[in-house]
Amino acid sequence: LTLGKSLTPFPKDANDFYHITKANDSLFARAACRNWNLKIIDVMQSTVFGVETESTKQINEFTRFDYDEIYGTVLNRFILQASANLPLTIYGGGKQSSGIMVLRDAINVLNKLKDFDIHSGSYQVINNNPKSYKILDLAQKVKNAFDARGKDTVFNTTDFDPRNESKNNSNI
């Protein structure tokens, strides 16, 4: 399936349990459109980082901050590791790339889509991946930001890759 300039595997493919659930969600949504004449827009977004939007700044509320030690949210993991004075762990050499976008940009795209008109029984996929970064470059950006604030941040680079990906994988 070609959408604009990007090639999207269809049916979706995944190599870990989390992303398999995402692929299944899309298949279920598509079946619901066919069977019950629903309108569904499936938004595929980059990894989202950040904790505030224009709305939350005005009412002094917080959004959630997700991270884990292996899957996804690599930028958040680096920020937490640096905050805790831990080395930034870079799996597989850091040449892999990942799409990253700021929370407020993700919200802006979703707000624009609320008026997107599709017909009943239609399933539309929107890919929102504005920019990709090498994992090592993200780690360097976090290191630079924390070093500028007086924290001596170091890397822990390991060949071990818990996601079992190619060291040069550009499709994270």
Language-model features: locations:
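Short, flexible, mixed-charge acidic loops at enzyme active sites
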Residues: L1-L3, S55-I59, N168-N171
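Active-site Tyr-X1-5-Lys
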Residues: L1-S46, V74-A84
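Active-site pre-Tyr helix/loop in NAD(P)-dependent dehydrogenases
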Residues: S6, S46-V51, Q96-S97, K131
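Residue-level signature of the cytosolic catalytic core of signaling kinases
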Residues: D13, Y67-Y71, K131
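Glycine/proline-rich active-site loop of Rossmann-fold NAD(P)-dependent oxidoreductases
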Residues: A23, W36-L38, V48-N76, L86, ...
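Conserved donor sugar-nucleotide recognition element shared by glycan-biosynthetic enzymes
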Residues: D25, Y71-V74, I135, N168
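Short, function-defining helix-loop hinge/capping sites that tune catalysis or transport
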Residues: R30, E52-S55, I135
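C-terminal substrate-binding subdomain of Rossmann-fold SDR/epimerase-dehydratase oxidoreductases
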Residues: A82-I172
